Amino acid sequence: EVKYLEQQLDNSLMRLGVEQIDLYYVHRRDPFVPVEEVTQTLASFIKSGKIAGFGFSEISPTTLQAAHAVHPVAAVQSEYSLSTRTPELGVIQTCAEQNITFVAFSPVGRSLLTDKPHNREMAVTIPFLENNPRFLEPNLSYNIAFASKFRDLAFDLGLTAAGLAIAWCLAKGDHILPIPGTRNVDHFKAMVAGSKRILTLEELMAVESVLPIGWAAGDRYSESQWKGPERYT
């Protein structure tokens, strides 16, 4: 509802102590409310000066096109990495065509694309991963073993696996902005190093040869985690 959205926005402005939010996301939209109506409401927030732009998270290409037809969308945030390439089925292309920033979260595959992927013992301590299909056995052992060639390739290229994952992500489009998360300074520096590495066509082909589309075993979300994101094929 318009009143609910505006109240949440006003609450955010108050908590942040600012007069305008640069980018306001609808992370999980109500599928029973037409996206055109939601977009009109968000556009009214721009007109009132409360936000500078808005974006959506985990929406389909069709939904994005419908929203953008009402008012320009500033950004789309979706999971995207060498282990999750679904956005290549239209979202990334639509963003490029419409000059929309594509914000890639989990670009290192929730640790699968790092030098030290989470084992099952670690996964059970992380609520989101505890029942995530890719971190359940036998999928997890398969995924860690399969990605070993990627880790070897990263080493040969003078990067960490996470650094190479970031370099690959950036190479997929000038409009793509990966947002990895880490609490470790060394890991952060390694990913920054990856962001500065421009991969050659041969290197890109090598990366996608060792980790082809669809290599990861298990869905990226459990059934309960799928509540909110739009599925599309």
What spans do the regions from the language model cover?
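Glycine-rich phosphate-binding active-site loops on the catalytic face of alpha/beta enzymes
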Residues: I176-H187
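Glycine-enriched alpha-helix->loop->beta-strand junction motifs that scaffold or abut catalytic
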Residues: K50, H68-A75, T94-V103, D174-I176
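Glycine/proline-rich, positively charged
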Residues: E1-T86, G90
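Conserved, mostly hydrophobic/aromatic
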Residues: S12, I21, P34, F54, ...
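Aromatic-lined glycan-binding groove of carbohydrate-active enzymes
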Residues: P87-T125, T160
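Glycine-rich beta-alpha junction loops
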Residues: S60, Y80-T84, S106-L113, W168, ...
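Terminal-tail/helix-coil boundary detector
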Residues: E97, T125-D152, D156, A171, ...
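Short, hinge-like loop/turn segments at secondary-structure boundaries
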Residues: E1, H71-A74, I92-A96, N119-V124, ...
